[in-house]
Each structure stands twice: as C-alpha cells, then as structure tokens.
Amino acid sequence: EFFEENIKQLNLFVMGVGNVGSKFLAQVRQQRSYLKKNLKLNIRVIGISNSRTMVFDDGGIALDDWKSLLADGQKADKPKFFETVQKLNYRNSIFVDNTASEEVATTYGSYIGNSISVVTCNKIACASEFENYQKLKNLAREYNAPFLFETNVGAGLPIIDTLKHLIASGDKVLKIQAVLSGSLNFVFNNF
C-alpha cells in the first residue's frame, strides 16, 4: 500500500452502455491492471446508466457483472444521476457520455461547472452553436475540468490532439482539406 501512494484514482460515471458504452467498459476492465502498473492510474467505475436504469457503487462497480447490476438498479433519472455524482464529490471525477442524446449533451456545463471532467463521443455539443462549444471550453479552463471529445472527429482518429501538438510546437496550420463524411469517404476510396 505504501508504494501505491503515487497512483492517481480516476472515478468514472458512465452514461450510455449500448454498443460503444459496453465496449468502453470492456476495454476499461481489460486494461485496468496495465493502466495501474504502467501509468499509475487506478480506474473505478462508480456509476453506470442507460435509458432505463442506473446503478452506483462507492467502492467501484464490478465490471465483470455490470450488466446484471445495472438491470437490478434504480430507475434512470438524469438529474438524479448528476446530483449523485455531485454529492459523492470525488476528486478526479469524469462523466463519460456514450449516448447520442441532446438532453445529455446539455448537461455538460453543469458537470464541468462542478469540476467534473467530461469525455464524450456525443457529437451534439460540439456540432451545435459555436457559442455553446466556446462556453464549455471556457468552463473547462475555469474549473480545471477537461472537456474531451476526440472521437467526434475523423472517425475517432486523434486529429484534434495532433493539431494541438503541431500548433504548440510552433507550426502554423494554413489550410485543412478533408472529406467530412465517413460515408462519402468510403465511396471515394472504394469506387
């Protein structure tokens, strides 16, 4: 235990466990020991919600049994989910949105404003009015709670992070050319 003092605890609250969300939880489960040993990150999933039910466990949800625990959980309630995350008040809390819900996307400001980081594959918040995106990024800076959305762009390729690193190293982006539709990109590359 003494040697684990440098391990950083991340507390995840996951909304949306369909195809993407369930794969995400499987990946967390599979990589948990690697992350702890090599990156000094201990990841605990504290809350999980789908559109019907939600479940919380202060000690961390057993990821080998999350589906049955969720099935036996309480009725899903987005405001109550947020209130529970807020009430638990864990350091290094991260809200993970694996939905395509506009209603969920509108809650990001509340999470970030309570110093809860947001990681999302939901495109809605970043594809709405630019002012909304700016507000979320400003809140993230003000409350030191990252707002991360890398999977929104380029079919999950690390485009945004790559651009940030290029700019940080002094490069100037003069022009970006892209096919912004995954479907059209497929057609152009195959026909």
Locate the predicted segments by residue.
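Short acidic, glycine/serine/threonine-rich loops at helix termini
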Residues: K23-Q27, F56-L63, F130-Y133, P158-K164, ...
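Glycine-rich beta-alpha junction loops
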Residues: S49-M54, V153-A155, V179-N185
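N-terminal glycine-/serine-/threonine-rich beta1-alpha1-beta2 phosphate-ribose binding loop
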Residues: E4-G113
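Conserved anion/nucleotide-ligand pocket segment
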Residues: T162-F191
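Glycine-enriched alpha-helix->loop->beta-strand junction motifs that scaffold or abut catalytic
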Residues: N114-V118, G182
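A short helix-to-beta-strand connector/capping loop
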Residues: L41, R91, Y143-F147, D171
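General beta-strand structural signal in soluble alpha/beta enzymes
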Residues: I94-D97, V118-C121, F147-T151, K175-A178
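Rossmann-fold NAD(P)-binding glycine/threonine-rich loop
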Residues: S101-G113, K123-L166
